[in-house]
């Protein structure tokens, strides 16, 4: 997941966003079959970013990583739970 971490940091820098923080890896609750448990997915939080900024963040990370990764900015009713999900997709 090193390429994902580097891409997230680079995208945040380019977009002038707060420093992202890894919020979930393989030691938290995820759905059955989650790639987090296989060390193939990470979630990143950027404090106080708008949904529009999150969508731009998603697009930039996806552009940097190219194919082979799924990048999703997930939004929740409680906006403090919004985060960027990045997973390696070997399919």
PLM regions and their residue ranges:
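Extended, low-complexity, intrinsically disordered C-terminal regulatory tails
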Residues: 1-33
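Catalytic cores and adjacent binding grooves of peptidoglycan-active enzymes
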Residues: 29-34, 38-91
